[in-house]
């Protein structure tokens, strides 16, 4: 059972806002174990130089490996280059989201479901759902 998970680091998000990248920075990963265990491992190894990773979303997907995830991620989201931002310490799977795109996606989903089209206040779970939906996890090859 392969699990796709999304994690956030509040300290890294503050750093992203300070340097002008975006405060919406998320780590996208895949694991064969439980997603909580994978996030605990991120904290233990201080992934990207941070020990405050929190799990914000997870989905069980069909077989996918880290290389396949990296390719799909690069095609669909803006992946932050660790060579340009050395503070990321070589982390190659940190994505930057545009809040307006996520808001538009949520509004379209709500409108199609027959709910009001008011722009909601986004939560980390909304960001994680947007990333997982954009990766098209149901069509992994």
Explain the meaning of each model-derived region.
Residues 1-141:
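Non-catalytic accessory segments flanking enzymatic or RNA/DNA-binding domains
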């Amino acid at each position: 059972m392969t699990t796709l998970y999304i994690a956030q680091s509040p300290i890294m998000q503050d750093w992203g806002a300070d340097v002008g990248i975006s405060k919406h920075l998320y780590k996208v990963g895949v694991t064969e174990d439980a997603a909580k265990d994978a996030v605990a491992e991120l904290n233990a190894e201080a992934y990207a130089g941070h020990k405050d990773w929190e799990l914000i979303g997870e989905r069980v997907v069909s077989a996918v490996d880290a290389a396949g995830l990296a390719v799909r991620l690069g095609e669909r989201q803006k992946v932050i280059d660790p060579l340009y931002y050395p503070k990321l310490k070589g982390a190659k799977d940190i994505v930057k989201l545009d809040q307006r795109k996520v808001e538009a996606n949520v509004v379209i989903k709500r409108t199609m479901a027959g709910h009001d089209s008011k722009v909601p206040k986004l939560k980390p779970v909304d960001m994680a759902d947007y990333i997982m939906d954009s990766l098209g996890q149901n069509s992994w090859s």
